[in-house]
């Protein structure tokens, strides 16, 4: 009979982490919206500013963690390789790396990149190759991890709850970015806060996942996890 995996850390710690993140988001919003100097505010929330720096540091750290465990965790090497590619794409996208492939990219959004008449065809093909590979990897990764994630959510494992929270916060960031009524300074502030918070949640979820594995290994070395891999 399959034994239900016990959440680690305990729920109180998970709740505390959520509260800390929500507090940081709220405090950041209050501080940024209280800035009267529009030029200074843009410096705070745009490229190179502290808000984006926090998020980009977190997502590149998450990418580095995935690469490390792709090398040291032999039972999950394939999973971590897929995840590391997804995180690399995520990190480069959030860092607006596509702006660097063409002098005209800065003037257009990513979704309109491929229809921009001044961007060379070879540049579009180069980026299209990366995007197609990203979609293939994402499909394979999500197809394999879906039952694992659902089982972890049912067990209320902290890493799964953080991953679910990431989905919600990431959705909010995209909603603010796409809805015209939010296209003002206030909307931009919340968009950047949501984006950075989502990236912090990714790193937090990955750390909690490793803590869960370590705890499960110590409490029951012979147990098989939700993905079918032995914990030990």
Feature annotation, model-predicted:
Residues 142-167:
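Membrane-helix boundary/juxtamembrane motif in polytopic membrane proteins
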Residues 102-106, 176-191:
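Interfacial helix-loop-helix junctions of multi-pass membrane proteins
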């Amino acid at each position: 009979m399959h034994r239900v995996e016990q959440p680690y850390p305990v729920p109180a710690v998970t709740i505390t982490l959520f509260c800390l993140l929500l507090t940081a988001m709220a405090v950041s919003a209050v501080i940024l919206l209280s800035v009267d100097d529009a030029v200074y505010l843009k410096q705070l929330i745009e490229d190179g500013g502290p808000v984006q720096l926090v998020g980009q540091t977190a997502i590149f750290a998450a990418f580095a963690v995935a690469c490390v465990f792709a090398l040291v965790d032999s039972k999950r090497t394939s999973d971590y390789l897929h995840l590391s590619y997804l995180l690399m794409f995520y990190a480069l996208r959030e860092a607006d790396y596509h702006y660097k492939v063409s002098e005209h990219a800065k003037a257009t959004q990513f979704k309109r990149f491929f229809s921009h008449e001044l961007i060379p065809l070879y540049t579009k093909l180069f980026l299209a190759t990366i995007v197609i590979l990203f979609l293939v990897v994402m499909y394979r990764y999500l197809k394999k991890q879906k039952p694992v994630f659902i089982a972890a959510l049912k067990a209320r494992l902290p890493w799964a709850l953080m991953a679910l929270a990431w989905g919600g916060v990431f959705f909010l960031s995209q909603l603010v970015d796409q809805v015209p009524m939010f296209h003002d300074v206030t909307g931009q502030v919340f968009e950047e806060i949501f984006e950075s918070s989502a990236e912090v949640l990714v790193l937090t979820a990955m750390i909690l996942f490793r803590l869960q594995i370590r705890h499960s290994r110590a409490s029951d070395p012979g147990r098989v996890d939700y993905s079918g891999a032995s914990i030990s």
